Amino acid sequence: EQRPAPLVRTLERLVPRLAWLYGYDKVPKGLVDRFAWAELAGPQGPVATEEVIIGLVLFAPGCTYPSHAHTGITESYFVLSGSVSQNDDGVFTPGSMLFNPPGRRHRITVGQRDPALLAYAWVGARDELAGQKLSFRKPRK
């Protein structure tokens, strides 16, 4: 049995009660209908806090979440199911952790067979967490 399987079974009861979102103001064409996310704790989550954002993200098989970075935010992922690659740096399976310090560009690619469910945590200053906007544009040189 996979290490996070008991956690996934526990989350199954919570998932229908979450407010799942299916995009942002501007979603890259290849990402439409390929992912959803729900905040568990944070400014928009059922557990209200301005100190951290914790949530779940579900990716469709074969989905590529474009390269992006978070200004002033440290982001960690915990793979709950499926398999993903970050920046083509190997394959991460259930139980794997991924860590992105502030400003590090990263791209998530999901395996072709199964969807991937990841838990994520964002840590940063309150103003950074509250004002975070995702941009999929490459920084100008």
Question: Predicted regions span which residues?
Answer:
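Short, conserved beta-strand element in jelly-roll/cupin
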Residues: 56-62, 69-85, 122
